């Protein structure tokens, strides 16, 4: 028995560390938080939060309206959410990935970010592609190709399509490390196409709100995105290190519904 005790203690420590692994990382001081009324909601509210070190979250912008997938939400794969039971995000399911995700690079048509922007940025050309083909070794990756020899899916994978909604693309790092074929790809923040036009999995908003977010982002803030239906936010905000409910000033439609 004395010999087994250290093993038992070590196992308990491992279990505790795993239980605490999910949630906003300690080095994240910029948080984008979106809440949907239900799993099947097409729309919700988004807020921007900041904190110093491990301090309390303070709301710096929002709420403002956003649109999600045309079929609602499903659990994604990122910093947190991948270990939750329930419906999983799949390619072309029309659902936005729920959970917590790191923010990747910003892509866009313009030579540089909007005034005030200071974040890794790549101006896309006709050579820039984001693969959504689960059969491709480059699935859910940004790649640069020879436009004279485009891949089979080039017409819908090219990032400079001329679509005004893609003027700015802020990468949401779902299913990224490494990508699992078929688990969902090309998830971004971008400009909405209309107030009643949900997406196939991205989170969209009015242009002025997207620009506000882009100019706020900083690499040193290790920004993350948390997207949850209200019932999951109410269950997890404390254990996932999210802003407490009293900081949200939620509208009635953003509360958990039975």
Describe the role of every protein-language-model region.
Residues 22-199, 208-258:
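Cell wall/extracellular polymer interaction/catalysis modules
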């Amino acid at each position: 028995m004395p010999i087994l005790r250290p093993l038992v203690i070590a196992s308990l420590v491992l279990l505790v560390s795993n239980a605490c692994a999910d949630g906003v990382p300690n080095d994240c001081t910029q948080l984008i938080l979106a809440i949907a009324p239900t799993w099947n909601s097409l729309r919700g509210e988004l807020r921007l939060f900041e904190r110093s070190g491990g301090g309390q979250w303070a709301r710096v912008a929002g709420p403002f309206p956003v649109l999600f997938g045309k079929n609602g939400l499903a659990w994604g794969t990122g910093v947190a959410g991948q270990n939750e039971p329930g419906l999983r995000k799949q390619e072309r399911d029309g659902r936005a990935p729920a959970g917590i995700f790191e923010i990747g690079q910003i892509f866009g048509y313009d030579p540089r970010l909007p005034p005030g922007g200071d974040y890794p940025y790549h101006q896309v050309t006709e050579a820039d592609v984001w693969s959504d083909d689960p059969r491709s070794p480059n699935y859910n990756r940004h790649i640069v190709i020879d436009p004279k020899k485009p891949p089979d899916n080039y017409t819908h994978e090219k990032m400079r399509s001329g679509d005004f909604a893609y003027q700015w693309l802020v990468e949401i790092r779902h299913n990224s490390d490494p990508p699992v074929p078929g688990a969902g790809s090309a998830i971004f923040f971008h400009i909405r196409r209309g107030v009643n036009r949900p997406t196939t999995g991205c989170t969209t908003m009015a242009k002025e709100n997207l620009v506000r977010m882009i100019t706020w982002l900083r690499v040193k803030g290790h920004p993350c995105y948390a997207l949850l239906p209200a019932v999951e936010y109410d269950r997890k905000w404390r254990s996932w290190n999210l802003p407490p409910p009293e900081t949200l000033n939620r509208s009635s439609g953003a509360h958990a519904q039975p």
